[in-house]
Amino acid sequence: MGVKLEVFRMSLYLTFPVVMFWISNQAEWFEDYVVQRKRELWPREKEGQRQELEEFKQKIRKQKEERLLQAAQQSS
């Protein structure tokens, strides 16, 4: 009984990773599960959203510059 159990366990240890690699490398599976899940988690950006972000970054940079200029003028 012990030898048969060890043979079964060893065959299970060897076949499980091989089967998992085979399944995960299937193109249809990858498209259905991985790419679709990625699109759900991180949807594509809208055009206006990127422009709003750039405007916000410029606004923050301008405020930082103004604070630095005020600090430089006060220290002089």
Curated annotation (Swiss-Prot):
The chain crosses the membrane at residues 7-24. It comes from the Eukaryota. Signal peptide: none annotated. One of its GO terms (cellular component) is mitochondrial inner membrane. It is a single-pass membrane protein. InterPro entries: Pet100. Keywords: Membrane, Mitochondrion, Mitochondrion inner membrane, Transit peptide, Transmembrane, Transmembrane helix. The keyword Transit peptide applies. GO terms for biological process: mitochondrial cytochrome c oxidase assembly. It is found in: Membrane; Mitochondrion; Mitochondrion inner membrane. PANTHER family: PROTEIN PET100 HOMOLOG, MITOCHONDRIAL. Belongs to the PET100 family. Plays a role in mitochondrial complex IV assembly. Interacts with COX7A2. This is Protein PET100 homolog, mitochondrial. It comes from Mus musculus. The lineage of its organism: Eukaryota, Metazoa, Chordata, Craniata, Vertebrata.
